[in-house]
Swiss-Prot record:
It comes from Pseudomonas aeruginosa (strain ATCC 15692 / DSM 22644 / CIP 104116 / JCM 14847 / LMG 12228 / 1C / PRS 101 / PAO1). Its EC number is 4.1.1.111. Pfam families: AsnC_trans_reg2 (PF17805), NirdL-like_HTH (PF22451). GO terms for molecular function: lyase activity. The keyword Transcription does not apply. Involved in heme d1 biosynthesis. Catalyzes the decarboxylation of siroheme into didecarboxysiroheme. It catalyses: siroheme + 2 H(+) = 12,18-didecarboxysiroheme + 2 CO2. It comes from the Bacteria. Disruption phenotype: The nirDLGH mutant lacks dissimilatory nitrite reductase (NIR) activity. The NIR activity is restored by adding purified heme d1. Pathway: Porphyrin-containing compound metabolism. GO terms for biological process: heme biosynthetic process. This is Siroheme decarboxylase NirG subunit.
Length: 147
């Protein structure tokens, strides 16, 4: 990662302007061409520096629902369960934790009922218990990771 990548990622953490040509405005801010930004984003996604780049939507006002869930997955089955979840569009992401509950995942669906159905399906197909940890409150902390 070079200095331009750092400047780009630091700036992107504060969002894109909501306008017809956001990358053109960003290019003017960063003193580069729009194509440079798009190419760098592709490169950062390709090399794994970024795992995702896209909008975040507050799905609840639109009728959607999400939850955080956790599982205790035997090490011998961890990759199997991760691969199972990778094919489910309802699973936004899953990740390993060094804890008895070693797999955590975010489930996002069109409705609370679909969240419950997805977690029940996961229990059926994996044979493992799933701990549902729904959001109790929303906090906006302005998280930023300076690079």
């Amino acid at each position: 990662m070079d200095e331009f990548d750092r400047r780009l990622l630091n700036r992107l953490q504060h969002g894109l302007p909501l306008e017809p040509h956001p990358y053109a405005l960003l290019a003017a801010e960063l003193d580069c061409r729009e194509e440079d930004i798009l190419r760098r984003l592709d490169d950062l996604l390709d090399d794994g520096t970024l795992t995702r780049f896209g909008p975040l939507f507050d799905i609840e006002p639109l009728g959607g629902a999400f939850t955080l869930a956790a599982m205790s997955v035997p090490e011998a089955r961890f990759e199997e369960i991760a691969a199972l979840l990778a094919g489910w569009p309802q699973v936004a992401h899953n990740y390993r934790r060094e804890h008895a509950l070693n797999m955590w995942l975010v489930v996002a669906c069109d409705s609370p009922a679909e969240v419950a159905e997805t977690l029940a399906r996961l229990e059926r197909e994996s044979g493992l218990a799933v701990l549902d940890l729904p959001k109790e409150a929303t906090y906006h902390v302005g998280l930023h990771f300076p690079l």
